[in-house]
Amino acid sequence: MSGVRTREAGEVFGPRTALFADVLSVGLATSLVCLPLVTAPAALSTACAVLRGAGQDRPVTAGRYFALLRQRLRAGDLVAGAVALAGLLLFAADLALAGAGLPGATVFAATAAAIAACAAVVALRACARPESLTDWRAAVREAARDAGADVGGSGLVLLAVATAALCAWMLLPLAFLAPGPLALALTAVDVRRSAAVPR
């Protein structure tokens, strides 16, 4: 197999498993950065940017992740995190109210879940957009446009979130690695969309 690259000196993993190992290391770094919660959008956006670099022969390492994160952290990232956290708390409060036995609780819970799913798709697709590194408003605007125009991609985003949540539920330590494969899935959906619609 002449097209297969051989392992270089000092390389821990072979060429077939290198990206997988890199995704897991970036996932672990992302989990650590997400711990304050308000840093979650910036952490996921940075992971997507690092993984996007794999297609351009740039290294996908935790070191590059932290270097890029140091360059881009700004007040807008914390505001985006605060908005995301407020949305999660509002959704949790809505579900608690629906579970309290109020009239029409079933319809209310279903409506709240649908709105939350749409908001999550737009937010996650915004994290995968290159614009999220510098301008969250532009990233959200483009992500909302993509979410409506690319329904298949939005379905893939929901499937990736469900898979990450299921893995974390089945085995708790996987929760610390789940952001890596999730970021890879988000990046793949965005790259797929970019290839389909040249910008």
Question: Where are the regions that the model predicts?
Answer:
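Helix-coil boundary and N-terminal low-complexity module in membrane systems
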Residues: 1-110, 119-199
